[in-house]
Structure formats: structure tokens, C-alpha cells
């Protein structure tokens, strides 16, 4: 067969693909929704942890930023 790829190679490729999808899509999307819910009520330590995760997941945040747009909530006057 021309496409006789060893099982170990397929396993490693699947592992790399799943880790990259998790790092670039799943974790940043979860962080976006968490930040949207907790931004105005977070304590100082929680805000520091949020800033760390934004720094850590920055490539995924850049990848998702054109599609997710969370504007501030409308104020009741």
C-alpha cells in the first residue's frame, strides 16, 4: 500500500492535533465566556489570574477575536 503509516505516527499526529485545537480554540473560548461573566465582579486576585490566562492563551484569543465581540452591557438610566 502507498499509505502504510505506522500506528505510532498516527497516534502522535492525533495527539498533536488535539492539543493544538484545545490550546487554540477550546480554552480561549472558555476564557472569553468566563471573562464576559466575571469581569465586573472579580476580586483583585481573580483579576490577576484572568490576566495570566489572557497572556498564556493569547494566540487563541487573537484567533477567536474577529468572531467574538463582547461589548459592555447597556446601562439602565
UniProtKB/Swiss-Prot annotation:
Listed EC numbers: 7.1.1.-
Family: Belongs to the complex I NdhL subunit family.
EC top class, as a word: translocase
Subunit structure and binding partners: NDH-1 can be composed of about 15 different subunits; different subcomplexes with different compositions have been identified which probably have different functions.
One matching Pfam family: NdhL
Intracellular or extracellular location(s): Cellular thylakoid membrane
Protein name: NAD(P)H-quinone oxidoreductase subunit L
Biological role: NDH-1 shuttles electrons from an unknown electron donor, via FMN and iron-sulfur (Fe-S) centers, to quinones in the respiratory and/or the photosynthetic chain. The immediate electron acceptor for the enzyme in this species is believed to be plastoquinone. Couples the redox reaction to proton translocation, and thus conserves the redox energy in a proton gradient. Cyanobacterial NDH-1 also plays a role in inorganic carbon-concentration.
GO molecular function: oxidoreductase activity, acting on NAD(P)H, quinone or similar compound as acceptor; quinone binding
Transmembrane segments: 10-30, 48-68
Organism: Picosynechococcus sp. (strain ATCC 27264 / PCC 7002 / PR-6) (Agmenellum quadruplicatum)
Catalytic function, reaction form: a plastoquinone + NADH + (n+1) H(+)(in) = a plastoquinol + NAD(+) + n H(+)(out); a plastoquinone + NADPH + (n+1) H(+)(in) = a plastoquinol + NADP(+) + n H(+)(out)
Main localization of the protein described in the UniProt heading: membrane
Keyword tags: Membrane, NAD, NADP, Plastoquinone, Quinone, Thylakoid, Translocase, Transmembrane, Transmembrane helix, Transport
